[in-house]
Amino acid sequence: MRLPADAVLLVIDAEDAIDDPRLSRGDAAEAGRNIAALVAAWRAEGLTLVHVGGRSAAPAVAPLDGETVIARDGASAFAGAALEPMLDELGATTLVLCGGLKTHALEATAWRAADLGYQVFVVADACRAVDAVDLNGRLWPAEAVRALTLARLKGETATIVDAATALRAAAAAKARQRREAGRA
């Protein structure tokens, strides 16, 4: 995974991903730690971070003063007037997504971002889902919903990565930017 220095981390519905006990119980602690690690890394490297949806009670991922918070007007983070113009102004070409899959906002955002031409990475172990019941009344556990959602996104819509890979890529992107700035 190679990230440009303009890679934007979208933390989608962190309040769901971390604070909602109904979400994929098996990976709850890991997802919360990974979301917090991604947020900390983007902050430390001075990379752009955008919070989409509500505000988490978890201090490690709560928006800091000056960080962008965007409310969704629909399923996707692009539903509304704020995100796309902001990304255009930043010259962003790459989005890294993490957070909750409860309302399908992360999935809808990934699809829309790909349609708009962004390179999209989804951090699998920094996403959580909720149980779902299909049309036949069968209960699908959150872990299965999460796996299926990631499988649908994998390929032409998004590249699925783990948090360790995304963290290394963020550090490498900033290091490249510093080297290039030193040559200028």
Walk through the language-model features, giving the residues of each.
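N-terminal nucleotide-binding beta1-loop-alpha1 segment
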Residues: V8-A14
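Short acidic, Gly/Ser-rich segments with clustered Asp/Glu that frequently serve as metal-coordination loops
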Residues: E15-P21
